[in-house]
From Swiss-Prot:
Pfam families: ESAG1 (PF03238). Residues 1-23 form the signal peptide. Keywords: Glycoprotein, Signal. It comes from Trypanosoma brucei brucei. Disulfide bonds: none annotated. This is VSG expression site-associated protein 117A. It comes from the Eukaryota. Not known but may be related to activation of the variant surface glycoprotein genes. InterPro entries: ESAG. The keyword Glycoprotein applies. Glycans are attached at residues 72, 290, 313.
Length: 325
């Protein structure tokens, strides 16, 4: 997934608001009450970034499959309509030339009708594909951009929190001016199942597992490294606030406190709806299989139609119609 400008529905609260204990919180709360710490915060954040990545991948695949099936179905329908039109034109020209050969003429008419029926069936399926790709083109590209921005923002926050978790357990030096916030490799913290309500699926039902539709992280006992929090504060203010169009607020008055709130339902709800438009890949696969099957039957009928024409040595009349039959 490509990194783009951060746009995240995140808000951060003042210190006084966060003195409320976990039992009184209106949202899913991860704090340092009763010995909790940043390790669990990383797990909750990583769950969100993984879920966004999964949504992005599935949305990208839905868009690609819709476009691919549309292109194939359109090509097949155009070919069938072209051959049917040529056959109809030729039939009207040669019917008078066949004289009393009513049996062959009836067969040609029957084959022509069969081709028309098959074209109509493929046309009906194509109309469904067309409606699906129209909806997908309208919704999914912009949803992919939003998902990528949210993913980028949450992944960056996760990375900077992980800097704290990974640091040596020792007091920070008094001077932190040269401290840099950098990546530290793979997360080695073990995460309990309760830290990822979205692990079994990113859907409305899973979002209900977040109390109040939100996640709040509140670490105030000094577990946060001042040396990491100062550049993090600068990073969020210079990058996130300048490009988030008001969706991100950061109030960081204490260098050793980490306070973060995410409107999980507001982030994922619209994305789930947008990525749910159009037909899913499994349905599209069945539709293109049906279209291909109808095309095979059409080709058989068309072959029978042309065989009668060639057997009666009427190719000269075909040339006169400028047909490619």
């Amino acid at each position: 997934m490509k990194v783009t400008i951060v746009e995240l529905v995140v808000w951060l609260f003042s210190v006084n608001f966060f003195v409320v204990v976990a039992e009184e919180s209106r949202w899913t709360l991860v704090d340092d009450h009763y010995g909790k710490n940043l390790h669990e915060s990383v797990c909750y954040l990583r769950c969100l970034s993984n879920a966004l990545n999964k949504l992005y991948s599935e949305g990208e695949r839905r868009l690609f499959v819709n476009e691919e099936v549309y292109a194939n179905a359109s090509r097949i329908l155009d070919d069938m309509e072209g051959k049917t039109g040529e056959s109809t034109t030729y039939l009207s020209v040669v019917s008078s030339e066949m004289g009393g050969e009513n049996n062959k003429l009836e067969k040609l008419i029957s084959y022509g009708n069969a081709m028309g029926d098959l074209v109509a069936k493929v046309g009906g399926l194509f109309a469904e594909v067309n409606e699906s790709v129209r909806a997908v083109r309208e919704e999914i590209p912009s949803a992919l951009i939003r998902a990528n921005k949210y993913y980028t923002a949450i992944a960056e926050i996760t990375r900077t929190v992980w800097d704290d978790v990974n640091r040596p357990l020792q007091q920070d030096k008094a001077t932190c001016g040269d401290q840099k916030v950098t990546g530290v490799g793979e997360l080695k913290t073990e995460c309990g199942a309760h830290t990822c309500p979205l692990s079994d699926g990113v859907n409305e039902s899973a979002l209900q597992k977040y109390k109040g539709g939100c996640l709040e992280i509140n670490v105030m006992s000094g577990s946060v490294s001042e040396c990491f929090n100062l550049p993090r504060n600068k990073l969020y203010r210079s990058v996130a606030l300048s490009s988030s169009h008001g969706f991100l607020k950061w109030y960081q008055d204490e260098a050793k406190r980490f306070q973060l709130g995410l409107r999980v339902k507001n982030i994922f709800g619209p994305l789930i709806a947008s990525f749910g438009v159009g037909q899913p890949p499994s349905v599209l696969a069945e539709m293109i299989n049906n279209i291909t099957s109808l095309q095979s039957r059409f080709n058989e009928v068309h072959s029978n139609f042309t065989s009668i024409l060639l057997a009666d040595n009427l190719t000269a009349d075909v040339d006169n119609t400028d047909s490619t039959i």
